């Protein structure tokens, strides 16, 4: 009889809102950025690359001042792929600094695999991209898909 009473007491304790609380899942993911911007770089030109990076940092700083976040992706394709190549990037140190200072906003650099494979065939060797570079199948498809998801598009 004692076991039945004890079990009934436990049942009441765990189902009563006054004694037990439901555990809520802990969200370990950072919140989704409030703004999203993709910037295309398709020229092997230091000025164009610097302009794209300036656009990215200006947007990040602007929204930081408003206590808001932004996701920025710089997508390099065609001759612009040199921006993300370890051996030819004229802006690799600046990219590293931007990556380190973007938080809580996010910045991603993506490279068109179609362009990368064509350059590898032409040069007869594999190409190494900057650390953290995301390889996408086709740059134009990446731009299309991000815009379909509501990302704003800029081409310097």
Regions found by a protein language model. Name each.
Residues 70-84, 115:
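Acidic helix-start/capping segments at beta-turn-to-alpha-helix junctions
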Residues 50-65:
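Histidine-anchored nucleotide/phosphate-binding helix
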Residues 85-156:
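A cross-taxonomic marker for long C-terminal extensions/tails that follow the last structured domain
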Residues 1-4:
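Positively charged n-region of N-terminal signal peptides that target proteins for export
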């Amino acid at each position: 009889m004692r076991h039945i009473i004890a079990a009934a007491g436990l049942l009441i304790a765990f189902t009563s809102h006054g004694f037990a609380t439901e555990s809520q899942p802990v969200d370990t993911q950072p919140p989704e950025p409030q703004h999203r911007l993709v910037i295309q770089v398709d020229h092997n030109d230091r000025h164009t690359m610097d302009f794209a990076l300036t656009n990215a940092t200006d947007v990040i700083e602007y929204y930081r001042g408003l206590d808001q976040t932004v996701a920025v992706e710089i997508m390099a394709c065609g001759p612009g792929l040199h921006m993300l190549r370890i051996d030819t990037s004229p802006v690799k140190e600046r990219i590293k600094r931007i990556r380190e200072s973007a938080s809580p906003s996010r910045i991603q650099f993506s490279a068109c695999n179609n362009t990368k494979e064509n350059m590898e065939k032409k040069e007869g060797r594999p190409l190494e991209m900057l650390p953290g570079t995301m390889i996408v199948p086709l740059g134009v498809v990446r731009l299309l898909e991000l815009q379909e998801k509501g990302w704003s598009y800029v081409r310097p």
